[in-house]
UniProtKB/Swiss-Prot annotation:
Annotated InterPro entries: Epimerase_deHydtase (IPR001509), NAD(P)-bd_dom_sf (IPR036291), NAD(P)_dehydrat-like (IPR050425)
Alphabetical GO biological process terms: flavonoid biosynthetic process
Protein name: Putative anthocyanidin reductase
EC number(s) on file: 1.3.1.-
Higher taxonomy: Eukaryota, Viridiplantae, Streptophyta, Embryophyta, Tracheophyta
Keyword terms, alphabetized: Flavonoid biosynthesis, NADP, Oxidoreductase
Broad enzyme group: oxidoreductase
Biological or metabolic pathway of the protein: Secondary metabolite biosynthesis; flavonoid biosynthesis
Tissue specificity statement from the Swiss-Prot or TrEMBL entry: Highly expressed in leaves and weakly in stems. Not expressed in roots.
Record: residues binding NADP(+): 44, 51, 71-72, 91-93, 172, 176, 199-202, 214
Active site feature: 176
Amino acid sequence: MAPQAYPTAGQTTTVCVTGAAGFMASWLVKRLLEKGYIVHATVRDPENKAKVSHLLNLPGATDRLKLFRAELCEDGSFDAAVAGCNGVFHVATPTEFMPKDPENDLIKPAIEGTLNVLKSCTKVDSIKRVVVTSSAATVSINNSSEQNQYIDESCWTDVNFLTSQKPPGWAYPVSKTLAEQAALKYAEEHSLDVVTVIPVLVVGPAVTPTVPSSVELALSLITGDEFKMGALKGMQFVSGSISLVHIDDVCSAQIFLMEKPSAQGRYICFPVNTGIPQLAEFLSKRYPQYKVPTKFDDVPATPKLTISSQKLLDCGFSFKYGIEDIYDQAIEYMKTKGLLTC
């Protein structure tokens, strides 16, 4: 491959975003358009206006956004979308957390889909870098009972533990871990510049027509949604902590890493690492109008690990939103959706 300069914002720079109709990817498209990029966005059905109108209505979309049909597990499906691009943001991923057939419904599609995107990218000389969105589920899950664990980009989730013990939701972290490992291996074998971004619970406003499940999850202590609260507890039980990042920060980090020539490898991306008891105490004090539970007998009193974003910070990135901003904006967003009233 003989790519040119690293992508930079401007009306002559074209990038592709996969899975563009989703929560994170649609916000990423929004931010890229704001910065002046030309955006090729992949969706499953460009003609389904109910699923893509939020993209077409973004400022700048009329002149600088083009939708492409693509399917993760269809060979060559991303060829047209990445053609002529300078960079690619691979965000698309299967998100069925409780699949009936984990191997065929979630794990294989995640791996094959990622490789299909990368194979398309190797056909295009102008592509300088691919930024792959991974997950903290790829670094934080293990069978250790050790407290105060320090997690950084050198850590990998224990896939053998997950596949043997099968805790609730086990297939998703397995799919993300194996997909990221496959991406990095493919990149090395084919001299493709791939950087991975590792966020966790992404929270904030959305341009999607429906409320993102991660926002509902993060706000379950406020809304009282027992099912979502149970899932939040399960997250801490399996991964060891609750970590949060604002949607705008993670998208800014993706763009930052696309544009940063020296970026390489994996980057954990979130500023807030806590546990449910600590999070509940914060929420009850900051938002006393809501009945936030503060007594928990079924979750650890403190998180067993700390996940570090130091590598990203050392690269020159800075987070704009702390926990107060994350929840202030998420609550206001839920009010606009009529899901919170005070």
